[in-house]
């Protein structure tokens, strides 16, 4: 739960400072290692909708945190995805 809170807040702060054209990489290896132990779908441990970041490392729990930047993650803002090494996420700001 502590890592979920940490990363939800960190991602929200990064998105608040983001501008179109930016690509942001975030190392989340410690959180991803926990999600693997919990047999979670690694691609869905981070979700973003309606200015709300949710980080969920297991079936139970999760932590959400809102951001204020008027970015939209519905195709306008390209996307976010697990990096190739599966150690973090990449956020592409459209």
Protein language model annotation of sequence segments:
Residues 1-94:
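Long, compositionally biased, intrinsically disordered regions
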């Amino acid at each position: 739960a502590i890592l979920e809170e940490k990363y939800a807040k960190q991602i929200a702060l990064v998105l608040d400072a983001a501008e179109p054209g930016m690509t942001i990489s975030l190392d989340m290896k410690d959180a991803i290692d926990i999600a693997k132990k919990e047999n979670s779908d690694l691609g869905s441990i981070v979700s973003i909708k309606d200015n709300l970041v949710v980080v969920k490392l297991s079936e139970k729990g999760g932590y959400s945190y809102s951001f204020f930047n008027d970015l939209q993650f519905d195709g306008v803002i390209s996307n976010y995805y697990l990096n190739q090494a599966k150690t973090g996420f990449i956020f592409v700001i459209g």
